[in-house]
Curated annotation (Swiss-Prot):
Name of the protein described by the UniProt record: Large ribosomal subunit protein uL5
InterPro entries assigned to the protein according to its UniProt record, in alphabetical order: Ribosomal_uL5, Ribosomal_uL5_bac-type, Ribosomal_uL5_C, Ribosomal_uL5_CS, Ribosomal_uL5_dom_sf, Ribosomal_uL5_N
Annotated source species: Photobacterium profundum (strain SS9)
Subunit annotation: Part of the 50S ribosomal subunit; part of the 5S rRNA/L5/L18/L25 subcomplex. Contacts the 5S rRNA and the P site tRNA. Forms a bridge to the 30S subunit in the 70S ribosome.
Job description of the protein: This is one of the proteins that bind and probably mediate the attachment of the 5S RNA into the large ribosomal subunit, where it forms part of the central protuberance. In the 70S ribosome it contacts protein S13 of the 30S subunit (bridge B1b), connecting the 2 subunits; this bridge is implicated in subunit movement. Contacts the P site tRNA; the 5S rRNA and some of its associated proteins might help stabilize positioning of ribosome-bound tRNAs.
GO annotation terms (biological process): translation
Molecular function, one GO term: rRNA binding
Length: 179
């Protein structure tokens, strides 16, 4: 079992029950899933780029990504419906907690010129999204074998009803928000 999951059960739940005065511990917000998405628009011309992106995503997440396809044709971008244009991974359970722990303790501190994550990136329903400009902040990626630097989107989906509850949940894990 991941250390952060134990920490959530033993400490965070009690803190949030006291802070928001929940009547049941089932009302306490929890992290439901973490979604990683990598858009590879250049994959239209070079299929190898998408394969390399999928390999990077597999190393980062620990599971094989789903190749995303274009939903509709856009002449301006020279894409047609059904073209593979990216990959995504949805993490739940044990893998989610392992990834979340690595994200907070290892990857985020390795971001260049890091001054904290934007506290305004909540969506109004208690979910937090962030973008990473370089996949090389993750220790699983070998810097020498990277063909090109790619960014990815990370969305943390919580069961919180509001942004305030979600921010309290993530802050309890020492999530590095900007002051």
């Amino acid at each position: 079992m991941a250390k952060l999951h134990d920490y959530y059960k033993e400490t965070v739940v009690k803190e949030l029950v006291e802070k928001f005065e929940y009547k049941s511990i089932m009302q306490v917000p929890r992290i439901e899933k973490i979604t990683l998405n990598m858009g590879v628009g250049e994959a239209i011309n070079d299929k190898k780029l998408l394969e390399n992106a999928a390999a990077d995503m597999t190393a980062i997440a620990g599971q094989k990504p789903l190749i995303t396809k274009a939903r509709k044709s856009v002449a301006g971008f020279k894409i047609r419906e059904g073209y593979p244009i990216g990959c995504k991974v949805t993490l739940r359970g044990e893998r989610m907690w392992d990834f979340f722990e690595r994200l907070i303790s290892i990857a985020v501190p390795r971001i260049r010129d890091f001054r904290g994550l934007n506290p305004n990136s909540f969506d109004g329903r208690g979910n937090y999204s962030m973008g990473v400009r370089e996949q090389i902040i993750f220790p699983e990626i070998d810097y020498d074998k990277v063909d090109r630097v790619r960014g990815l989107d990370i969305t943390i989906t919580t069961s919180a009803a509001s942004d305030e509850e979600s921010k309290a949940l993530l802050s309890a894990f020492n999530f590095p928000f900007r002051k």
